[in-house]
């Protein structure tokens, strides 16, 4: 099959008519060299590389980028260069194994760093590499096993009904064979530019990583008196993230951020000026009016965001209840009908048999139970039984929510669902008698397993849809996904420990916003102090009101919770996306520029994140440049703004090259 002839059928993205069948790009009647030394080696390499990059970026800014598109571009680039015969078939497997990186990373870094964060307060708490590795691995395996019975429902039965934005983009890259080879060049150049830019800041500190209105006396005055401050992170990777997220989603995230920073924070200083609000946290001894905007945000604003995220997760389950029922009944029918159906299935409809899935699920849950019993609960049978029941039920219920979210908007509200899991796990574990630091570690490991399972389910449904469009054998994707999970779990465990040793999660140099939220939620619950339920309730009410007005509540709540300096760059990137894709009167030119922008943004993200890992490795090895006193100077922030403007100008000029 020649690369040039590879095109998607015209019914790939629309609903099928009565009696119409979807014929994938690769014929179901032919056998292709999908799994071989080439595809497995590159897949494992991509899983390692992007796990390290995604873990660094996720812990630094709280956003995990989906690696599917950059991996697909690299796969197409290397297979074109090597003139591979069955390049398309191999590339789907490379992408499928490699894409485990983002899924496992999101699961691990949203929860497990909370153990390190709480360690500063409770030195007796500890997390070994094995605990991080095993919880990530088991969570990933559970996610894969729980999703396979729903493959046919999401991928085939709902064909054309769900947009699958990320799967669509990745499929287009894989299909564009020749074009994909040329796409690798701008991606690599952008990776070098973004990587060098972020490396200079992280390693040498030539300019500050943030620009704030505190750089001048007037701004400092406004921050202290009116509690109003503006901040923006000037990094290349976060800017690229904003471009890919797009203006609409970035705008809603920033609205949430500004609602907290410019309405709630100054509002609280005005209303409760001379009061010490420490009902939830006895360590707070300062009156609200005497706090800095940052302190008010940390003590009160974030909790409102947490309430919003949790409620958005509940709303997600309610909305998805019909899907859960349909998918479960379909899976049950498949299981019952499997034995009597002696027909050999067509290659593109072949899954791992339901018998194997059922046995695999039982074994995995049994191993998870043993891990909880001996590795986490120190031999307490009751705690281990309660823990495994909670994890299995929550992971199963939320699996379809995660897959549905990815199918519709391409983003997985995993942090909100995990936050709910943690609150539920903490309340239940305290009720059965597990409290204190042991309870915290247990609940966080449980949260880590659930979070990785949900993250994996969402990511995997993307892979399976790509395979469906292109004609891959689902069984091969499903089987080799386990290897990618193993590699990614080992990599993320190593990177997390490296970053903790280098920077320390409690230092403030790693935002790790989700893990900080988990730590903030779990600490009071496990110590009997009680949580700031009133603040959670305010956030929950905001989420309900937003849902009524059809505003994406999760995006808004995430903005309320993630620090402002990491939200504003998303808006900058989103605005540049809008600018680049609307400049020309010719729609085709706009579309081409937008796609070129996606490539450059992907390069910024991958390059910036990978060089961030290199910078952390250098620091770990003792190569440290002291730039703290320089960063305290307003000039470093002004220079930061100049560098940022130059980066944006470069980005816009680079997209213009697509004529």
Model region roles, listed by residue range:
Residues 1-659:
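Alpha-helical multipass membrane-protein architecture
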């Amino acid at each position: 099959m020649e690369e040039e002839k590879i095109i998607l059928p015209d019914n790939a993205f629309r609903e099928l008519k009565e009696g119409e069948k979807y014929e994938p790009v690769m014929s179901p009647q032919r056998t292709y060299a999908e799994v071989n030394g080439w595809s497995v080696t590159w897949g494992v390499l991509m899983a390692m590389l992007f796990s390290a990059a995604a873990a660094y970026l996720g812990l630094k800014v709280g956003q995990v980028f989906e690696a599917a598109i950059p991996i697909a571009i690299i796969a197409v680039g290397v297979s074109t260069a090597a003139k591979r015969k069955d390049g398309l078939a191999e590339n789907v497997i490379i992408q499928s194994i490699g894409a485990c990186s983002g899924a496992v990373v999101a699961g691990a870094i949203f929860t497990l760093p909370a153990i390190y964060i709480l360690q500063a307060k409770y030195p007796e708490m500890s997390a070994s590499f094995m605990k991080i590795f095993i919880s990530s691995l088991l969570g990933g395996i559970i996610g894969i096993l729980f999703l396979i019975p729903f493959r046919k429902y999401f991928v085939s039965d709902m064909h054309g009904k769900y947009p699958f934005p990320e799967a669509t983009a990745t499929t287009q890259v894989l299909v564009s064979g020749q074009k994909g080879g040329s796409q690798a060049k701008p991606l690599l150049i952008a990776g070098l530019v973004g990587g060098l830019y972020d490396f200079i800041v992280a390693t040498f500190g030539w300019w500050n990583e943030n620009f704030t209105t505190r750089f001048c006396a007037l701004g400092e005055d406004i921050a202290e008196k009116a509690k109003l401050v503006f901040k923006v992170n000037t990094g290349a990777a976060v800017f690229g993230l904003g471009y890919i997220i797009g203006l609409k989603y970035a705008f809603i995230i920033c609205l949430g951020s500004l609602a907290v920073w410019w309405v709630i924070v100054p509002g609280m200083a005005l209303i409760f000026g001379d009061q010490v609000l420490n009902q939830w946290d006895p360590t707070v001894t300062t009156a609200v009016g005497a706090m800095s905007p940052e302190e008010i945000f940390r003590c009160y604003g974030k909790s409102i965001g947490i309430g919003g995220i949790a409620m958005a997760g509940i709303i997600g389950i309610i909305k998805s209840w019909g899907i859960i029922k349909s998918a479960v009944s379909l899976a049950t029918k498949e299981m019952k009908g499997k034995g009597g159906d002696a027909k050999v299935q067509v290659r593109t409809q072949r899954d791992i048999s339901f018998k194997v899935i059922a046995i695999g699920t039982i074994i995995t849950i049994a191993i998870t139970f043993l891990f909880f019993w001996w590795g986490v609960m120190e031999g307490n049978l009751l705690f281990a039984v309660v823990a495994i029941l909670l994890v299995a039920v929550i992971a199963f219920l939320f699996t379809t929510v995660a897959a549905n979210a990815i199918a519709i908007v391409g983003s997985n509200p995993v942090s909100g669902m995990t936050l709910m899991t943690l609150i539920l796990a903490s309340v239940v574990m305290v009720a059965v008698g597990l409290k204190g630091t042991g309870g915290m570690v247990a609940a966080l490991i449980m949260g880590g397993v659930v979070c990785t399972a949900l993250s994996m389910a969402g990511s995997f449904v993307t892979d399976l849809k790509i395979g469906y469009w292109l004609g891959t054998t689902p069984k091969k994707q499903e089987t080799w996904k386990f290897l990618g999970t193993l590699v990614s779990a080992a990599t993320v465990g190593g990177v997390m420990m490296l970053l903790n040793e280098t920077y320390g999660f409690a230092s403030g140099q790693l935002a790790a916003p989700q893990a900080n939220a988990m730590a903030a939620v779990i600490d009071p619950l496990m110590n009997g102090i009680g949580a700031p339920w009133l603040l959670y309730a305010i956030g929950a009410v905001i989420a309900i009101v937003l849902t009524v007005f059809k505003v994406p509540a999760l995006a808004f709540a995430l903005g309320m919770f993630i620090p402002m300096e990491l939200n504003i760059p998303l808006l900058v990137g989103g605005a540049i996306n809008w600018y680049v894709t609307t400049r020309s009167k010719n729609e085709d030119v706009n579309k081409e520029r937008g796609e070129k922008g996606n490539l450059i943004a992907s390069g910024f993200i991958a390059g910036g994140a990978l060089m961030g890992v290199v910078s952390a490795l250098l620091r770990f090895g003792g190569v440290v440049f002291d730039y703290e006193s320089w960063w305290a100077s307003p000039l470093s922030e002004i220079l930061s703004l100049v560098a940022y403007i130059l980066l944006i100008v470069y980005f816009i000029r680079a997209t213009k090259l697509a004529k």
